[in-house]
Amino acid sequence: MHPLIQALADKHGFTPVTEKTLDECAAPLGVAMLTICGDPKNVSESLDLAIVAPEIVKAFRGAVTPLVATAEAERHFQMRFGFSLFPVLVFLRHGEYLGAITRIRDWSDYMAEIPAILQRQASLPPQFELSRGCGNIAAH
């Protein structure tokens, strides 16, 4: 794992989760923010999210509990939460899907989109569609 992504757990207190531990970890939490960076060798923005994610957690002053996907779990989470692009932030309430933000955004976009996601009712995530992966930057 790249040192900047590892620092999410080691320095910033993000709890690492796998496909086997996410449900148990997220269920008791009010709102969890699952950070899924992607492979820095293949995803140019992955390290940007590793820098921005701790700042988002600080900005929301305890409203979200930070989690980080292990590299081995990222593709599983992609299928489970239906996103096509990395990096991504997935928001869960008591382990249930609220929404996701793909790619890197302007700070003002995060500050507008995250509160809107946090107000949503839990729902099923979108189904993963491979064809959505080309050029789609919309939030789910």
Model-predicted regions and their roles:
Residues 1-31, 120-140:
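N-terminal leader/targeting and pre-domain segments
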Residues 16, 36-38, 49, 54-75:
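Thiol-based oxidoreductase modules, predominantly thioredoxin-like and allied folds used
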Residues 30-32, 81-93:
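Structural micro-motif
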Residues 39-43:
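Short histidine/acidic/glycine/proline-rich micro-motifs that form metal-
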Residues 45-46, 100:
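Alpha-helix N-cap/helix-start motif
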Residues 46-50, 111:
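Conserved strand-to-helix beginnings and helix N-cap segments that scaffold or border functional pockets
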Residues 64-80, 84-87, 102-105:
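Charged, surface-exposed interaction regions in soluble eukaryotic proteins
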Residues 90-131:
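Non-catalytic, surface beta->alpha helical segment in thiol-disulfide oxidoreductase systems
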